[in-house]
Each structure stands twice: as C-alpha cells, then as structure tokens.
Amino acid sequence: MGVYKKLFRYVPNEKYIGYMTIIVSSISAFLVVYGYYYIFLLLKEAVVKGNYENAGYYSTRIVICLTISAVMYLVSGIVSHKLAFRLETNLRKRGIEGLTDASFRFFDLHSSGYIRKTIDDNAAKTHMAVAHMLPDNSQAFLVPIFAFILAFAISLRVGIVIIVLSVVSGLILMGMMGNKDFMKLYQTSLDKLSSETVEYIRGIQVIKIFGSKLRSFKALHDSIMEYSKYAYDYSLSCKTPYVIYQLIFLGLIAIISIPLSFFLTGIKDPKFMAVELIMIFFLSGVIMVSFMKIMWASMNIYNANFAIDSLEELYEKMQEDKLTYGNRDHFDNFNIEFENVSFSYGDKKVLENLSFSLEEKKTYALVGHSGSGKSTIAKLLSGFYKVDGGAIKIGGYPLSEYTKEAIIRNISFVFQDSKLFKKSIYDNVALANENAGRDKVMKALSLAGCDEIIEKFKDRENTIIGSKGVYLSGGEKQRIAIARAILKNSPIVIMDEASAAIDADNEYELQKAFKNLMKDKTVIMIAHRMTSIRNVDEIIVLEKGNVIERGDNDSLVKTGGLYSRLLSLYETANDWRVSNEKLL
C-alpha cells in the first residue's frame, strides 16, 4: 500500500521488519484456516461416519495449528511494535531537526499548540497502522480467501452461503467507512480542537485571573462544537449498517438454522448437512472478525495517511525558510546596512525595499506606531529570519555569508519578556559564555545591578530560580538577562521593549545596567518610553515599513513630524491623572 511506502521511508534500515511481520502473519492466517479444516475432518469422521478412532489425531492437529498460529501472530505483533516505536521516534526526531533548522518566521506563523500537535499526535497516529494493522491486515485479507477455499472444499452449498454472506456484509461495511471528504473534515476538526486546547491550557493563568468562561474563547468553543458535530454525524452514519452487520452474522444464521434443523431428517444426507451448518457457523465467525479488521484497517490506514501527509506538509513548511549559513567566521567591522530588504509574514507584507545604514559603536532607537516594522527589523538583525528580498549586511557582507556561530557570538538580545531557566542565578548568566570564569560571571552580575538580588537569598548566586520560595519580579529577571548579555560581550546589542514593563523601583538600577551593557557597542533599541531614548545617537522613525525620519531628539522635535507627534502623545498620556470622576 502507498501509505506503507511513505512510512517505511522513515525507517529505511528497519523496513525488513515490516516484510517479516507480513510473512509471519500470513503463515498464521493459513494455520488458522487449516485448523478449521481439521475441525471439518473431525466432524465428518465423528458425525457422518460415526468413527471416533481418529478423534485424538484430528484434535491434536487442531490444537497444534491454532497454537502455532497464535504464537506466530504474537511474534508478528511484537516485531511490528518494535518497528512502530522506531518509526514514531524517527518522525519526532525529523520534526525536532526541522524545528532547529526553521527560521523564526515559521514560529511566528504557527502556534506552539499546532506544532506540538502536528508532530507529536500525528507521529502517534502512525503507531496503530504499523504496530497493529500490519499483522492484522495480512490476516484480515488472507483469512477470508483461505476460508472461501475451505468452504467450497466442504461443499458447493457452504461455499455459496459464505460468498453471499461476505458480499452482503462487505457492502454494509462500506457504508460504515465514510467517504474521504468527510473523514478529512473530521480529522481537520480534531487537529484544530487539539491545537486550540493546548493554547487555552497555556493561557490558563490569565483565564483564571479574569474569570473568563469557555464561550469567551470563540476559537476553542467553535472548534469543540465543530468536532462534536462531525463526531455525532459519523456515529449516526455507522449505527444502522453496524446493527445490520451484527444481525446477519450473529442473528440471521442462528434464526435460519433453528427451523432448518427440524427438517434434517427429510434431507438425503442430514448428518453431512448438520456438519455443513456447523462449518458455516465457524467460517462466518472467522470472516466476521476479518471483515471487522478490514474496517478498522481502512480507518487506521486513512488516519496514518492523513498523519504522514500532515507531517510532511509541516516538514516542507520548515524547509521553506530554512536558514543557510556561510563560512565567514569574522566580522571586519560592525557597520549595519539594510539593502532593499523585503519581508512578509505569510501574505502580509511588512517591509518592502527598505534601505538604511547604521554605524558601529553608536546607539540607535527605532520609533513608530504599532505594526510599523520596528520589531521586525530587530528580528531580522538576529540572522534567524530569511528575508524575501535584498540583503542585510554587517561588516560589508550579507548575514548569510557568516557562520551560525559567528552570528550568535557577535549579536546579543534583551527582550521585554526575558526567559530564565530553572537553574541557579549563576548558571543562567554563565550560559552566555561557557568559557567565562567565576570572576567574570560575578562581575557581570554586579554591572547589571544584581548584587541586591543575590543578597536577598540564602544561597546567593547559587539560588535556583523557580524553586520553592524563590520569586523574582519582572525588573529583577530583566537585570539577570542583562547580566547574561554583559557576560556575552557581543559587539552588537538589540533591545526590544526591554524596559516596557519595569516598575519605578527597578528603573534606576535597570538604566545603570543598560549603560554598562551598551558601552562601546552598536546598539539598536525599541522603546515605548520616549524618555529612555532622548540621549541616543540617532532616532529612526518608521511608518508602514519605511524610514520617514531620522536624526537626534532635538532635530526631530524641531521638524515637527511623526516623532514630534508621538512624543507629544507620550507626554500627554504620562501627565494623565484620575481626577474626581466616577469610575464605572
């Protein structure tokens, strides 16, 4: 089958296990039916001929066939599970490798819930198709064939009855499988529900704070209602065919057989007719189980096909913006140049043919309305985004010509929401430079104004962040992040809203830390606090992805352009006070 060709591509060295599973399971299927052949011979000898001398011989053969069949089926299942777990592992590894290669734009366009669900859940969906369906499929398709042969070998009547039952049952089962379009809608709604649920759970703290109800989260509520509709419709579509199917195999044969048994004496060979009825019972049961396996196989194979297609689609999206690096390991200087740079998030164009240059060892501030491209420019400078057109150059060469290590080594970031790991304060800073000694780490902490933070705790710099009783404010976390950047000592520093949420108690210490961090560096900063950028070397004003003004604070104020208006709005907002107005 096509789906197994796709799956086996991810386990090239173990696909022989799959073929081994099919062979062993096929032998098991043959032995099952062969066991029923010996049952027929036993019944024929005992019932028709009244000969019990060979009963022990046939009984032994029945036990041997069915036992070996069960053991071989068990072995095929164990082997197929080994292959399935290896496949799941390789699919997840491929996903993780793709994530490490993907540009940051991929993560901006795809939620973490969607990525986790697509990789983890879809990898798990392939398990059933390989671990269970691989051995089951062989039996499901071969057992009916062997059973048909045995039925006609018994008699023409048994063969015709079994064929008619199989055809009718097959038609009924087709009504239970659902069409591909419906199954695709069902799977898509399930994917959407899983993704929205993950995002909902990750935001549960905010949800509880505001006492929000599920209905207020329209995306999650709609996905739940949509999935419930498809699940209910699918259940209803299966109800009638499944009841009829059960009735035919479990009820109809019994209903017909009871009155028929009263007329056995009027039949030419009633004893053989009785044996035929018993074999119809046996063979119809075997075929019923096989057909149910076929139904589940078709569903699980469809799920596996959908899963592998979803994974490969995600892998392709990861590769679309795969970052490429060069061999240049040294920056001649740290002048920055945007040369006709274009960039978009999906279909949304953010920058188009943007050009400007920044001199090394100067401090620049990016200012503009929300959506003007400030954060995008900062992100592009990181080297972890692939531009749609143009080039970003540092030291006269495009970023794509430098090694990944060179970019990481020479560019530092301080963001508004700095991430600290559940390690000691010391380790959180030291990871910026693994070769730095203890003295350098402690000096970086001191320059970032972290001395008073360390003194609060009994274990000082060895205090584990996130452990019981250890709480850090936003400003304290930010200072530790700045210490990390100071220790890294990169020539280029990018600060995106680094002081946006800092309280008054921390602002003074933070500004001192910023001063130590920015010394003799090329600094690009984004800040909503206009007071924090008045003393920078140059302010660059952006609107709709274009530079419309640039200069120092005084010259831009005199110009009376967008910067002047933004500064005026900031001062007005800063002077706003709650008076004697009644707040509702």
Where are these regions (language model features)?
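A hydrophobic transmembrane-helix motif
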Residues: I27-L41, I68-V71, P135-M177, L236-S284
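Transmembrane-helix motif of ABC transporter permease domains
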Residues: Y16-G35, V47-E88, A274-F282, V289
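An intracellular "coupling" helix at the cytosolic face of ABC transporter transmembrane type-1 domains
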Residues: R9-Y16, F104, D121-V130, L134, ...
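Helix-to-loop junction immediately C-terminal to a conserved catalytic motif
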Residues: S382
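C-terminal portion of ABC ATPase nucleotide-binding domains
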Residues: K512, R529, R534-L584
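Membrane-integrated ABC transporters
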Residues: M1-L31, N54-Y58, S80, K125, ...
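Cytosolic ends of transmembrane helices, especially the final helix of ABC transmembrane type-1 domains
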Residues: L193, S212, L236-K239, I287-E316, ...
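ABC ATPase nucleotide-binding domain helical subdomain, centered on the C-loop/LSGGQ "ABC signature"
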Residues: K93, K393, E401, Y426-S467, ...
